[in-house]
Amino acid sequence: MMGKAYWMAGTCCCALCFVNPVHAQSGTTAGDGGQDIIVTATRREQRLQDVPLAVTALSADTLRTRGIENAADLGTGKVPGLAVNSLFGSEVSIALNMRGYGTSDASQGTQDQAVAFYLDGINLPRAQGMSLDLVTPERIEVLRGPQGQLFGRNAEAGAIQIVSKRPSGNLGGDLSAGYGNFNARFVKARVDLPEIAGFRVQLSGIYRQHDGYLDNVRNPLLENVRLYSSPLSSFHFPVANYDRDPGQLNSHGFRIAVERDFGKLNVFYTYDDSWARDDQGFSQFVTSPAAGTIFNPPGGNGPAFISNAAGTFTQAALDRGRYPTSVPFSFLYVPFINKGHGHMLNLALEANDNLTLKSITGIRQSLRYGGADIALSVSTFQPGSTEYLLSKTFSQELQAIYGTDGFNMTLGGIYFHETDKDERDSNLVTNCALPIPGTCDAASGQPTRPWYITSDKFKRQFSRTSAFAVYAQASYTPAILDDRLELTGGLRYSKDSKKARRTVLNGVTLATPQSNEARTDRFDPAFMAKFKLADDVNIYARYARGFRDGGANVRSVIFSAYQPETLDSYEFGLKSQWLVRRVTLNIAAFRNIVNNQQQSLQSNPSVDPSLTDTFNVQSKYKTTGIEVELSARPTPQLSLSVNYTYLHSNLRFVGIDKGTINSFALTNPTFNAQGALIPSAADIAAHPNASFIQLYPLGSPKHSGSIAADYWTPIGDYRLSAHLEWVRSGDMWVASPVRLVTNTTNGVALPNPYYVSPVSSNRVNGRITLGDIKFGGGVKGEIAFWGKNIFNHVDGSHAFGSGNALTPNMPQPMSSIYLQSPRTFGGDLRLTF
């Protein structure tokens, strides 16, 4: 792998990098008012409104105005059909869902995502929030629906493509710095150097940091100590203070881009390197509602708190009406370290006026290690986990793009290789309620050791993926109907192999490693028809199939392979502009059907919440939805935009055979008065000791959307602009379900009272900017003041089932929930030259 990296770097020193840049004109989704945005959603340049599929393009101005600084800021409701949630509250590790579908356990090291994430044509299998921070985006394209015919493996639900700004060859730059509450500060810079011997060079850098969102209780016993990690682990915690405020972030990185033309050959090379330290915050708890429903077990009206027997540590349930400002006891702060770097080489040759040949090569490495408290945040009995995930990828793609009047075709082939090293461990923090020697200070009752170990659960596994594919997509305009009809067909052949091997289980090196393999050998088609009703009014119909690779669950003790899944999508859409392109209205209606769905399931949350199993669901997952994008420019100075998504996904009930985690569909299940699932006597007899679960849809809020307004006015020689938006998302589930019904006896269901809370979002954001400030010497600037979550709404980002003791100190089924950020505000200064 290093040899390939050196080869690329050497090549770039000789002839550096990239195809002719695709220039998106300055505009925003909030109201481009007739300006054409050029996108490459079909691997060739097209006007956004002419692309026969659902695409949203966010320009650089839009990203800055809406405060989108990293992938996590895309947020649920900001883009139709896209749901984004931070895993366990992290700002760096995120999960992407598109049109009600994603990944049920996105933090697994070896499970592929359902939404592909691309940076300048290179697939990032582990989406990193820093990827957006390190580049100056020309635009972000969000493609909804299966994109496998052109964007490759694991784009079954959709794809996100970041297109960076190319080096200009002229001396210029963009420098921003800002400060906000929670001691937030950032500096971001991009400099284009003057062209030298035909080489155009761009340098970028970023530094971003903020303090924690909650005040921790300082504890000298958690300072200047070392957290436990297995002797077999590839990393060990340093001696440090582990009573820091939760919710902190510290990140920095740099990027270099070099471009040169050699006649008709364009060469573009980039290298980026990033580092970030984040944590997973402080988990609150919420209780199951008193009245049970089909989605949750019945709770109660008892006191909502958890505590140890002596009452030394007590935590009340989350108050949804008030954002917490502190934790109720000394909380163990456990950080994660994220490192990543990568090379990209893009060659483009204009063979003639109709044919362009491209080569896109990528080498990347990412590393994430650290730990977290999981389940309920009470120090008296708190599970914790550590993980180490090292991913190395290499990809090589070749493209031939041919176009004439009435006919366009893209041919391509791609090879992708990834190796993963994944280590995981589970342990417990200090438990002062139990007589464990050395864990508590007798006088204060405070913890004296951060973690102790009840049993060694350390696991180490390796995964190797090799994927090869060839694809073709062609569009043809027949000489009928005044050339208003365009027909498109695409086909992709994929041959993938994923091998997994476990060498350590529960702290013991295995004499014979566990191993499994998942293989894929398949064809996936796509068909589209577009008809132009008028110059600015198009309708289209689309069918596409996508798939996601199988693999092995690194969290599972069973370590059995799960198989690939497929998604069939049927879509009808309208793309239109009215009133001299002052009003844009796009509508898409779709139905997705997932077969052989990969589903993760918490194995035993009360013993070890980090353990999950993954299996293929035998019943189909179906989602029907409508997406609406409306933007208008009533006056040259005012832009308005609305987007709305409606999703309806089916609730399924399946059984899991004991020991094998093979699933089966239930026949004629019923429900009791509290909504608990009761399997039929026939299912119980046919599957003794099976577990029965209900699978709710993940990343599928029934309603989501946003309303935004942008206004500007001149003030002397300056330009004053304002942006205000309301982003709303209804309830959605984001974590693996638990077994809600177990141990059926004589046809009677005994509910297992676990509760998994949904999360939602309700945020108002704003920004006021004074621009066109001239500093002389060609330097211009702007000063902005901004606020996010202005009304300090309490919104969740991640939640999972964690408590069902039903004791006097824990009287109700409970769920752990990590919160989105509270109200943040600040100002920044931007200089351009």
Regions found by a protein language model. Give the residues of each.
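N-terminal Sec signal peptide and the immediately downstream disordered periplasmic leader
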Residues: M1-G77, L349, L831
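N-terminal periplasmic accessory domains that precede
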Residues: D36, A72, A95-N97, Y118, ...
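Short acidic/polar hinge/loop motifs at secondary-structure boundaries
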Residues: V84, S107, A114-P146
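Transmembrane beta-barrel wall of Gram-negative outer-membrane proteins
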Residues: G172, Y179-T287, K339-L345, K392, ...
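Outer-membrane beta-barrel domain signature, strongest for Gram-negative TonB-dependent receptors
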Residues: F237-R244, L249-T410, F416-T419, T584-L585
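Membrane-embedded beta-barrel scaffold of Gram-negative outer-membrane proteins
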Residues: N346-E350, T356-G362, L367-A372, K532, ...
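Gram-negative outer-membrane beta-barrel transporters
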Residues: N408-T410, I480-L481, L487, N616-P737
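C-terminal beta-signal and adjacent terminal beta-strands/loops
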Residues: Q637, S649, G716-R719, V727-T744, ...
